[in-house]
């Protein structure tokens, strides 16, 4: 056996333990830093998720409100359409009759009513 190799072998075995411990300490420290950074990033993501959840809830409420308003408006339009179609049917009935006497009476009554209202408000 070579005497020179034995001290190197002994020395390397001595320093191997120290280096491994140093590496282990550095890697555990690095692991703790990574864990801390991950926790901060997770908290930031959690805040964003909460904000998005609140925002989506507000959007949902706004959409529901608009849908109810549009439904009411549609119902009002349907009732107005029914009223106007009834009025148009009455006008058709009046104008389809060939009686000029009836038409003359209708026009004269409108003109007379207009004149009475005009003189009363004057």
Curated annotation (Swiss-Prot):
Record domain t-SNARE coiled-coil homology: where: 32-94
Cysteine pairings via disulfide bonds: none
Membrane side Vesicular: residue ranges: 122
Keyword ATP-binding recorded: no
Topological type in the membrane: Single-pass type IV membrane protein
Residues spanning the membrane: 104-121
GO cellular component, one term: plasma membrane
Protein name: Bet1-like SNARE 1-1
Lineage of the organism: Eukaryota, Viridiplantae, Streptophyta, Embryophyta, Tracheophyta
Gene: BET11
């Amino acid at each position: 056996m070579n005497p020179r190799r034995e001290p190197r072998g002994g020395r390397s075995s001595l320093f191997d333990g120290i280096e491994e411990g140093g590496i282990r300490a550095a890697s555990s420290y690095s692991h703790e830093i990574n864990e801390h950074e991950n926790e901060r990033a997770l908290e930031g993501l959690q805040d964003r998720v909460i904000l998005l959840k609140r925002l989506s809830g507000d959007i949902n409420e706004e959409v529901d409100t608009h849908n109810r308003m549009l439904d009411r408006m549609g119902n009002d339009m349907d009732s107005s359409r029914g009223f106007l179609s009834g009025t148009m049917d009455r006008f058709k009935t009046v104008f389809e009759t060939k009686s000029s006497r009836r038409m003359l009476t209708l026009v004269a009554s409108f003109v007379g009513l207009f004149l009475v209202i005009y003189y009363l408000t004057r």
